[in-house]
Amino acid sequence: MGKAVKMGIVASLKALKNAEISIPEAIIVGTGLGCLQDTEKFLTGILDNQEQHLTPTAFIQSTHNTVAGQIALNLCCKGLNFTFVNGATSFESAILEAKMQIQQQFLQNILVGGIDEKSDYTYNLYKLEKIIKSENQAPFSIFDATTQGTIFSEGATFFVLSDSLTTDTYAELVDVFFVNKTQNLNDFINHFLSKNGLSTDDIDLLISGRNANLDDVNGFDEVEKIFSASKIYYKHLSGD
């Protein structure tokens, strides 16, 4: 069992336990890269064995929907089982799908999560392409970024979305909205808030995804200037 599967099963079980739900009606997962370690293991096997005498195990466990499938097998859940692979917005896509399923009254509760793992070969390639930072560039600061690349990390997070308020409810998910490209961040944010009957002055706290990538500094600066509310940051602790 790969690391991504292990993380996914543990995180999903904890989420279900907190929600006091044994079997969800659906499982929706978002992943940007899938089970990288098993993917590399399978591809390495192809090269080492000259494309002969390969066992299918590593290939089966390398597919992007492996985590959602293994969670369903572990729970004996026969409901809807979706996996979204949409780059940096994979988790957001999963959340949006779950929200629409509940809003349209198709389902009453859904286990939804996001997961990604690190692997040695991909990690080294990303460093060469300056997508992530090298260890010799440490310490990394998200407030004073001077180099390209983000802080690479891995992990799993799961939530249970429900159509009703209970004593175990943490918060209400009001809206999810994202686009592929926007010419004006200010207009995009104000449109999102206005369609929910809000303005920037109504926001008490902004949770910023500011990272340590020099290429992203201007974008985060522009967004944070729009809000006068307090701001908190987390990627210096969790990575990207």
Predicted features and spans:
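Solvent-exposed alpha-helices and their adjacent loops that cap or buttress functional pockets
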Residues: 20-21, 52, 75-77, 102-104, ...
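Short, well-ordered, mixed-charge alpha-helical segments that flank or form enzyme active sites
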Residues: 35-38, 90-94, 118-123, 182-183
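Flexible, glycine/proline-enriched loop segments at strand-loop-helix junctions
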Residues: 54-59, 81-89, 144-148, 179
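Conserved beta-ketoacyl condensing-enzyme motif
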Residues: 1-70, 74-81, 116-118, 195-227
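Conserved active-site and cofactor/substrate-binding residues in soluble primary-metabolism enzymes
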Residues: 3-10, 22, 62, 66, ...
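Active-site-proximal alpha-helical scaffold in enzymes
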Residues: 9-18, 72-74, 82-113, 154-166
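Acyl-CoA/ACP chain-elongation machinery
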Residues: 106-128, 147, 175-185, 208-217, ...
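Condensing-enzyme catalytic core mediating Claisen C-C bond formation in acyl metabolism
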Residues: 126-205, 229-233
